[in-house]
Amino acid sequence: EDETVAAAELIGKAFCPPEAPMPTDALKARIDAFLEAHNTLALATGCGKWVRCTPLEYLRVDGRLYILTEGGLKFKGIWWNGAISAAVFDSYAGMASLAGLQMTGTAVYIDPLSDEYRSVIEARGVQLQQLQQMHAMLHAVRLDITHYELLDGALRSEGYAARQVLDLG
């Protein structure tokens, strides 16, 4: 099964490369701007034949992507293997304005006693007193993204292919 998936990925890369790729720095800037313009993603996790996709608000702190959550079934996949896929997208209004970002990477649970956790909570505007009064633990999860696929119909007018790929790992 793993060999079949690996073969399909190789075929996809060989036969479907971006036609007119953007320079890497310009693509990174475009991805950053897209993420800054949105605040909700669909996060998919899984293990074995079980998968879960959850809509979540996200925030960015020091260029990193985080979610805050009280828990739920998404943690089954996060604890099992950490592998995630996430998507951020605009409402569909036609091919010319089609815009979405698919991301693949790893979910990293942030220790609630760490400085990183405090930074994320503060960036979200949550006070320590509020955390103590909550009925459930507020978990912070960092999404370490290694692969981005941006689909943006507006790129065609700039001379680039609508589909752009940024591989960081």
Write out the residue ranges for each language-model feature:
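Short, charge-patterned binding micro-sites
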Residues: 94-96
